[in-house]
Amino acid sequence: MTALNQLTLTEAREGLATGEFTAVELTQSYLDAMAEARTLNAYVLETADKALAMAAESDKRIASGDAGKLEGLPIGVKDMFCTDGVRTTAGSKILGDFVPPYESTVTSQLWRDGAVMLGKLNNDEFAMGSSNETSAQGPVVSPWRREGDSAPLVPGGSSGGSAAAVAAFLCAGATGTDTGGSIRQPAAFTGTVGIKPTYGRCSRFGIIAYASSLDQAGPFARTVNDAAVLLRSMAGYDPKDSTSVNRSVPDYEDAVGASIKGKRIGIPREYRVEGLDPEIAGMWEEGAQWLRDAGAEVVDISLPHTKYALPTYYIVAPAEASSNLARYDGVRYGTRVPGRDIIDMYERTRAAGFGPEVRRRIMIGTYVLSAGYYDAYYVKAQKVRTLIKRDFDDVFAQGVDAVLTPATPSPAFGIGEKGSADPVEMYLQDIFTVTVNLAGLPGISVPAGLSCKNLPLGLQLIGRPFEEETLFSLAQVVEEAAGRFPVDDLWWK
């Protein structure tokens, strides 16, 4: 029999409904796995007592016929989500042992539907990173290894703890946030499914802000269907978030397995970038063929402003971050370094409390917003952002239903391998994902194969605004054609 923690979320839901096992037994299975996997550093806080208490309540509701949509299903929460009474650090020293007095809307909806909280998951500091190496709690180690090599690999970032935990069977699903690829890139690196919904589909209330016009919450899961189940509970209008969109939430699970016959899929020629890993280029071609075989029409398209996406993103996002992070001063909570006066205390606290990557992005953001450079950089970047969105609008107006691209330019790399000499080397990891955030579109990463070194490779599907259902239908075709890629060597045990 499959270990309880290795069941998919959908299988676990079925087992709980039929009484095959209890929510407490399922939760304990995950807690045991978490205890054996601390070397991965996926969790920064385990909430075992809370999890077992929530599971016991779930068992009562299941027995009385009052089960919610996620009743008894154990999940992990990225440490960017405020959790009432449970420490939340955003992966930064500056927040210290901050305990929020309120719950984020997304997590409150998960608990409303019966999900069980296993703990808080590691992430890059303030979600700034592509490898989960910038966290003040240390890097997350991927459960995957190159064939014949025990060197530790990154799980991707910034939601590296979420991706690693789902891949290593340390939760049935997890929450993530995606500002420039922080769900889709780690999902591709770990053989998991990750979706960034349309901007405004999930509430940002209670999520610690990085770049407010780009941030969006979404789920990680082991299958497309599992991701659909989680997104249904996470999505929805919230009056506490002025950017939340008041649209009804469909049952995304109904879209999984729906026919894609007649759908038009665009292949953007601008994504055929120099230096693209040949294995990823081959998988991209194969993915297009799988969609053709299922009845879709695949067409070449042009997104001409793609080449400006990365510099645009690394102006807009740091600009917003420098504003959002101005509030952290050491006065009320977190790190506090004494100074000669209050201004000196602020400066010393921020210098000690923020890590080097966060300090770098604050400085970039402050620079591009300064009086002498505002028009030259920030205003120009916003104009280019509009052009990038218009490229997608034009393609969708021509009848294209979704766009197929690689999720990442390479498989996972080693811890300490990239970005130490030149941060741009790390920023290039986001080359295929940032356009989606700049345009506010939904994007899903789905496992599509393994590299010659036995590492996961992912494909990305980009959809029209609020048409996540189309993405789930298309992603299911890829999943069925490619198969699933669970970690088969639990080397950390």
From Swiss-Prot:
Q: Which HAMAP family has this protein been placed in?
A: GatA
Recorded GO molecular functions are:
ATP binding; glutaminyl-tRNA synthase (glutamine-hydrolyzing) activity
Give the E.C. number(s): 6.3.5.7
Q: NCBIfam families recorded for this chain? A: gatA
Instruction: Say yes or no: keyword Ligase present.
Output: yes
Key words of the record: ATP-binding, Ligase, Nucleotide-binding, Protein biosynthesis
Q: What class of enzyme is it?
A: ligase
What this protein is called in its record is Glutamyl-tRNA(Gln) amidotransferase subunit A
Instruction: Tell me the Pfam families matching this sequence.
Output: Amidase
Q: Family per UniProt?
A: Belongs to the amidase family. GatA subfamily.
Q: Which InterPro entries match?
A: Amidase, Amidase_CS, Amidase_dom, AS_sf, GatA
* Lineage per the UniProt record: Bacteria, Pseudomonadati, Pseudomonadota, Alphaproteobacteria, Hyphomicrobiales
